[in-house]
Structure formats: structure tokens, C-alpha cells
Amino acid sequence: MAYLFTSESVSEGHPDKVADQISDALIDNFLAFDADSKVACETLVTTGQVILAGEVKSNTYLDVQQIAREVIRKIGYTKSEYMFEANSCGILSAIHEQSADINQGVDRAKPEEQGAGDQGMMFGYATNETENFMPLALDLSHKLLQELAILRRENKEITYLRPDAKSQVTLEYSDDNKPTRIDAIVISTQHDDFDEEAAMLAKIKKDVIEILIPRIIAKNPEHAHLFNDKINYHINPTGKFVIGGPHGDTGLTGRKIIVDTYGGKGAHGGGAFSGKDPSKVDRSAAYATRHIAKNLVAAGVADEILVQVSYAIGVAEPMGIFIETYGTSKVNLTNGEIAKKVEAIFDMRPYFIEQRLKLRNPIYSETAAYGHMGRKPETVTKTFSAPGGNEKTVTVELFTWEKLDFVDQVKTAFGL
């Protein structure tokens, strides 16, 4: 029997994502000047105020206020009527030194013996229902908001958009687990107060259906068949949405972990990513398990794969690796036997994850909105500034965990 599945996303201007982006901008700046920095940075954003708190072990000093303001400015909070504005918001820093008790579990004389920064379990997931091996409902939810942000910055076809927004896509699946159509789309977008409420809501709904949706279809022709005239659109269903962003809702780092990963597909170990340097396995091992799952699916081991890894704090070797193929395996092996082969291909000790995926680089700001997974790997050059005229330009690879660089090795190991 056909069934429905739903995923959501939030925009870069959503309060929780503002917090994530500030935390990850701090991570990038610390790593740019000291690649061995250990950082855990949490951010709270609310009406006219940003609070930074966390633990740091680094040889560099940063102007954290300036970094936070630049992130807020880039997102688009640049008007006083938003009640949260880059130049005028207050910024309080309570960042202090990392505990020596925690650090002793991570630092080792031999780098390869580096212990996990914490206990816990992390999951990676991949499915072949999209070209980027991501669940389709989440992928479309991200793309709706990315395109809405493009329209906001263009300020031509739609001129009233503000930074805060959310989306949700409900797909209908067939008995054989294939997406057949979009059943519903929900979009709530912050906007200027430009007319009477009923007129504003009618205009916004019309623009979403007649401007945003055609642009999504044009950029994603492989999914055009899923769009139809029976889609149930809920556009700003609560009414006008003028008060938004951190003024409308307080935002915190790490509160959008399902948006960041697989939209409710697969599983999640509970640990957030943003604000954590790669010694924190919550982040590095989640990227590594995604890398494994994606390469296994791309190699043809299964149509859908979930990978779990677990750690004890201060211990390099993982407690174990678990594989689930949801009955889609293409190889004559049990899930346990697949896991054994995976262990032989991918070294999951924290140091080797960092080296394999080049994680000790300033690559995290780009992950902090529109999902950490399913993004396109690319090489970029970035410039960072620190007090005293100190400047650093680095060329880095983004989203290395999305590379299909182990497919041949996987095929050889599994005889594919």
C-alpha cells in the first residue's frame, strides 16, 4: 500500500541556524590560524543579543564579536526593524579554556593513538533515490529554501522576503518504496509588512507557486514528474509572518540535527555538529559514516544503507561498526559480514578519519545551513583575519565526505 513520508528544512535565517553558523564560523577561524585547536562553542541568539559560550584550547586569539557580526550580516539581518541587526546587536562572550581533564583523553604522543573526544554512537545513511544519495523529501526541502534565499538576495521577482523561513515536503511512495508524487509542500517565510494581511498572504502564496516552484522544477528536471496540480500547498498557514528571526524565537546551536542529516530517514545518535572541532566524534564520525554509506550504495552493495559507529571517550578504536541494508543488499553477505569488510576498508580511529577527510581545515561554515550531507564537494580559497592585522589565506576542500573516492576499493572488496 502506498504511504507518505515527510521531511523539513529551515533557512539560513532561522534562529537556530544563525546560531549554528556563528558557532561554525568560530571553528573555521580557530582552525585557520591553529589547525590543532580544540573548540566547543555554543551560541544563543535572541532579540538584539548574541551570547557565545564554550571551551577552547588554541594558540590563536580571535575577535569573536567581529566574526559573529559578519555572519549575521552575510545572512541578511541588516535592518533595525528586524530587531536583530549585525551592527547593533549586543555580543557577550563567555568562551573559556578547555578542561585539562577532557584534553588528556584526546591528546597522545603518537597522533594515531588520539582518543575519541567523547563516548556515543554516530550514524551515516545513503539511498539511491537521488543523484546525491540523499532522501528525496529532505533534498527538496533544502532546495526550496536555497532557491527562496536566492530570490531574496536578487530582490527582483520577489521583493518582500526576510531571512527567516521553513519548508516541509510530504512525498507519496509506492509499495516498492519509490517516490511517485509530491503530496504536500509547506513553506513559512518571513516577510515585510507590505499590505493588508489577506492581500499579503494571497501574494506570497501566488509567488511561491508561480515563481519559486517553476524555478525548482527547472533546476531539478529529474524530479519534474513529481510536481502536479494536486499538491496541497500550505504557505504561511498561521497568517502573516513579519516578526521572525532571533526576535521572534530564540535560537541555539545544535537544535536542527535532523535537518542537518537525513530528515528522519536512517537514524541519529543525538550529537549535534556545529561548534565542534573534528576531535569531537559527534561530528567527524558522523561525516565518516556518511562517507562509508554513500560509497557502499554508489558501488552497488545495496540500494539503501545505514552505518553506525560507536566510541568510548579517550579510546581510539571504535567499540563497533553496525550495518543495516533494509533488505536491499545486492551481495550474498549478512549485514554483519558487510560490516567486517567495511572495517577492513575504512580506518575509523579519530586521527585517521581526520586525515582521510581533511577535517583539520576551516571547512565548516558552509555546512551550517541547508544540510551537512548531500552537498557538492568543491575546492575553495578562503581568507581569515585576526587582531593585529594577522591574515591567513587557505585553499581547502569542502564536503570531502561526499566524495565517491572509495567506490573502486569497495567494488574490489565485495567482488562487484
UniProtKB/Swiss-Prot annotation:
Amino acids binding L-methionine: 55, 98, 249, 280
Gene3D superfamilies, alphabetized: 3.30.300.10
One Pfam family linked to the record: S-AdoMet_synt_N
Leading EC class: transferase
Assigned EC number: 2.5.1.6
Cofactor(s) required, per the database record: Mg(2+); K(+)
GO CC term (a single one): cytoplasm
Subunit structure: Homotetramer; dimer of dimers.
Function: Catalyzes the formation of S-adenosylmethionine (AdoMet) from methionine and ATP. The overall synthetic reaction is composed of two sequential steps, AdoMet formation and the subsequent tripolyphosphate hydrolysis which occurs prior to release of AdoMet from the enzyme.
Protein name: S-adenosylmethionine synthase
The species this protein was found in: Flavobacterium johnsoniae (strain ATCC 17061 / DSM 2064 / JCM 8514 / BCRC 14874 / CCUG 350202 / NBRC 14942 / NCIMB 11054 / UW101) (Cytophaga johnsonae)
Organism lineage string: Bacteria, Pseudomonadati, Bacteroidota, Flavobacteriia, Flavobacteriales
